[in-house]
A protein has these predicted regions:
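Tandem repeat scaffolds
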Residues: 1-129, 136
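Charged, low-complexity intrinsically disordered regulatory/assembly segments
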Residues: 134-204
Length: 204
């Protein structure tokens, strides 16, 4: 199918399946591709901003001259995907190997590359204590931004938020989220926007 020149803003494509779809020149902003299958698709010249590829299967897809800005790659399949001329800027690339892909850049300076998610014990007891009750909020829990299965916390999100906020600030701001989050959201970029609102509330 043909999705050329499309503009996807804050979309949720979790667990969707696309095969042999042309997304040439499309723009993806604040979009979640969590556990999606995007196999043998053509993403040539696409621009991905604050988009999350979590456990995404990208086998055989073309990302020729694509731009990735503020994106997250965690796990997933890049077999035979072609990244010729693609650029990555301020992205987090976690537990992803480009070895089975074609033309995946060797030099990823200006990005954060990690072999695995940060360990659970990198999160302070105080912070864990405010994150855990937020599971009761359906919007927050379903977003997967703070909580993972088996009672675990999304340590990557916390690491990213700590570039903006101190531990104490997060302990203060996170409990304000249930009042502010009134719609379903899917990405860390959206969570950051909610925290900005929480900051204003806290100042008031």
């Amino acid at each position: 199918s043909d999705k050329q020149n499309s503009n996807f803003m804050y979309k949720d494509f979790e667990k969707t399946k696309s095969y042999h779809t042309s997304f040439i020149n499309a723009q993806f902003t604040g979009t979640s591709l969590r556990a999606a299958h995007m196999k043998y698709c053509n993403f040539t010249n696409c621009v991905f901003t604050a988009t999350e590829f979590i456990g995404t299967n990208l086998r055989g897809s073309k990302f020729i001259s694509a731009k990735f800005v503020d994106c997250i790659f965690s796990g997933g399949v890049l077999d035979k995907a072609n990244f010729k001329g693609a650029t990555f800027s301020n992205c987090y690339i976690v537990g992803v190997s480009g070895r089975s892909a074609y033309n995946f850049p060797d030099d990823l300076s200006g990005n954060v590359v990690l072999p695995a998610l940060p360990l659970q014990d990198t999160i302070s007891k105080e912070l864990s204590a405010v994150i855990e009750p937020l599971r009761e909020n359906d919007y927050i829990r379903r977003s997967h931004t703070l909580h993972l299965k088996n009672g675990k916390i999304n340590t990557l999100t916390i690491m990213i938020l700590k570039e903006i906020y101190s531990n104490d600030q997060l302990v203060q701001l996170l409990p304000l989220l249930p009042k502010i989050v009134t719609t379903q959201f899917y990405t860390i970029s959206h969570l950051k926007a909610f925290l900005k609102k929480a900051e204003k509330e806290a100042i008031l």
